[in-house]
């Protein structure tokens, strides 16, 4: 009976919405011009993959059976402006809102060293556009590789567990591989110039950092699973020296920000459809007013997005496909350090929803 429960536990739960899977966190933009890049990965152990034992009968070489490759996709358009939690509805009426559109692709690798330990790597690729109405105005288009991450992950208990639950901890190093000063054509004082694009569409931040993350799952009753994921990207650097074309004191260069993501909920298998799971949960992502380490000067748009996070996941053979559609229920553009010093409160544009899809292949 216990062995059957273990199999059921490993075939249940759906997570995700993002990029980089195999139980590992990557970076990706949040739903708006906050420029948060946190995201989460599939708990592959819960859909029949992710452990060495699960592939022990395959014909692939032993070293290849340790490998999982994941490809993620994320898209959203931000256009609703908020100051604090108050939407600036006049922006849409006056047709002067800023629109950001972002496509984010992600390739992640999880290589299992043992039942508990894995090596993680992630390469994000971003394609973004921004219709900026204030000077220097124009439609900016920026694309390229983002900031790569490499790290390790460990499960607290050796998989598979008889208790139908487990907790994983991971740490990753963020490499400054993405450009942070991408430029586009713009108009300033009637002249066409080449200007640095807004930091919300820059692929990287030109800074070293590190991410600490955790994820957990637990079967409760009627084959229902609870899940939780959380990650925090620590960026100790203060500013990166890239100009913003802003004139207020403390806002002339870009700030290098921490970023975070927390999500949790439950998952349940669809009756009479094997390996199909539906999930419902909540998520919170954004950037803080002040970083955990170092100063928090320069221009940033701190705030957060709280979303309802429905999704589905289907596993077949060595593949797992996951689709999520987080829908924002609360958006808050908080005051930054420079806002507080200047006695002001800037705004930020947010999206209503995000489309996230991930395909994972376990060799």
Short names for language-model regions:
Residues 40-47, 75-104, 200-201:
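Surface-exposed strand-loop-strand hairpins of Gram-negative outer-membrane beta-barrel proteins
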Residues 127-255:
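Outer-membrane pore/translocation modules
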Residues 73-75, 111, 123, 154-156, ...:
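Residue-level signature of outer-membrane beta-barrel architecture
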Residues 65, 99-105, 142-148, 165, ...:
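Residues that define the transmembrane beta-barrel architecture of outer-membrane proteins
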Residues 80-93, 233, 238-363:
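Outer membrane beta-barrel transmembrane domains
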Residues 31-34, 57-66, 80, 99, ...:
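Short loop/turn motifs that connect adjacent beta-strands in outer-membrane beta-barrel proteins
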Residues 69-77, 121-125, 169-175, 212, ...:
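Transmembrane beta-barrel strands of outer-membrane/channel proteins
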Residues 25, 94-155:
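Long, hydrophobic/aromatic-enriched structural stretches that serve as scaffold segments
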């Amino acid at each position: 009976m216990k062995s059957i429960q273990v199999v059921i536990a490993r075939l249940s739960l759906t997570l995700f919405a993002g990029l980089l899977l195999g139980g590992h966190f990557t970076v990706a933009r949040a739903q708006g011009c906050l420029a948060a890049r946190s995201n989460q990965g599939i708990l592959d152990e819960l859909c029949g993959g992710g452990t060495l034992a699960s592939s022990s009968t395959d014909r692939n070489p032993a070293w290849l059976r340790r490998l999982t490759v994941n490809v993620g996709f994320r898209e959203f358009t931000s256009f609703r402006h908020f100051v604090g939690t108050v939407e600036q509805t006049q922006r849409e009426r006056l047709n002067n809102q800023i629109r950001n559109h972002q496509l984010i692709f992600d390739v992640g690798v999880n290589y299992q060293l043992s039942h508990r330990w894995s090596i993680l790597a992630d390469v994000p690729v971003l394609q973004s556009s921004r219709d900026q109405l204030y000077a220097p105005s124009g439609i900016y288009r920026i694309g390229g590789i983002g900031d790569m991450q490499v790290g390790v992950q460990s499960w607290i208990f050796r998989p598979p567990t008889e208790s139908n639950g487990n907790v994983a901890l991971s740490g990753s190093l963020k490499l400054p591989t993405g450009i942070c000063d991408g430029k586009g054509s713009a108009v300033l004082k009637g002249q066409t110039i080449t200007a640095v694009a807004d930091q919300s569409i820059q692929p990287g931040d030109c800074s070293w950092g590190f991410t600490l993350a955790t994820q957990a799952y637990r079967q409760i009753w009627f084959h229902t699973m609870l899940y939780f994921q959380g990650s925090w990207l620590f960026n100790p650097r203060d500013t990166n020296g890239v100009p913003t074309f802003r004139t207020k004191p403390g806002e002339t260069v870009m700030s290098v920000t921490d970023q975070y993501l927390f999500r949790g909920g439950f998952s349940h298998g669809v009756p009479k459809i094997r390996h199909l799971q539906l999930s419902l949960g909540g998520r919170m992502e954004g950037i803080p007013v002040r970083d955990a380490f170092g100063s928090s000067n320069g221009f940033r748009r701190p705030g957060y997005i709280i979303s309802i996070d429905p999704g589905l996941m289907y596993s077949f053979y060595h593949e797992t496909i996951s689709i999520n559609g987080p829908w924002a229920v609360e958006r808050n553009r908080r005051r930054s350090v420079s806002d507080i010093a200047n006695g002001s409160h800037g705004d930020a544009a947010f999206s209503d929803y995000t489309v996230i899809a991930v395909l994972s292949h376990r060799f």
